[in-house]
């Protein structure tokens, strides 16, 4: 599984989380993995660990995004854009293995694929403030 595929899975897992109660999270993650055609137990474990790490830092991530997005409240942002930025912010601030430029570029690519017409530029603008 490539890093891009890992990011896409993590984005989908974060996005899915938005529509379920916290008590259903574990079950929803299992449903997500069941929906995938080919994923090894090792890949599933890796995704689980990364997903858990992101969730552990979610409060800090949201604070960083709120500070970077003056004029925008997180609860008013599109769920696609928000979760792409959460993933990228985790990589930028808490994952030393991912270069900042790569995290931003990958977030822009996810925004182009899953977001609306202005998502890529919106995500880019907010993430530029995250790295300042």
Swiss-Prot record:
Q: Tell me which InterPro entries the record gives.
A: NusB-like_sf, NusB_fam, NusB_RsmB_TIM44
Q: List the GO molecular function terms.
A: RNA binding
SS bond list: none
Keyword Hydrolase on this protein? no
Lineage: superkingdom: Bacteria
Q: What does this protein do?
A: Involved in transcription antitermination. Required for transcription of ribosomal RNA (rRNA) genes. Binds specifically to the boxA antiterminator sequence of the ribosomal RNA (rrn) operons.
Task: State the protein's name.
Answer: Transcription antitermination protein NusB
Q: Which organism is it from?
A: Lachnoclostridium phytofermentans (strain ATCC 700394 / DSM 18823 / ISDg)
């Amino acid at each position: 599984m490539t890093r891009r595929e890992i990011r896409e899975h993590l984005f989908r897992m974060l996005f899915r989380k938005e529509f379920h109660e916290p008590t259903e999270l574990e079950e929803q993650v299992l449903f997500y993995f069941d929906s995938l055609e080919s994923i090894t137990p090792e890949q599933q474990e890796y995704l689980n660990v990364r997903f858990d790490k992101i969730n552990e830092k979610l409060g800090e991530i949201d604070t960083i995004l709120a500070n970077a997005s003056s004029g925008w409240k997180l609860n008013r942002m599109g769920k696609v854009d928000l979760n792409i930025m959460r993933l990228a912010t985790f990589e930028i601030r808490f994952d030393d293995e991912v270069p900042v430029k790569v995290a931003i570029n990958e977030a822009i690519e996810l925004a182009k694929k899953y977001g609306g017409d202005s998502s890529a530029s919106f995500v880019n603008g907010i993430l530029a403030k995250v790295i300042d």
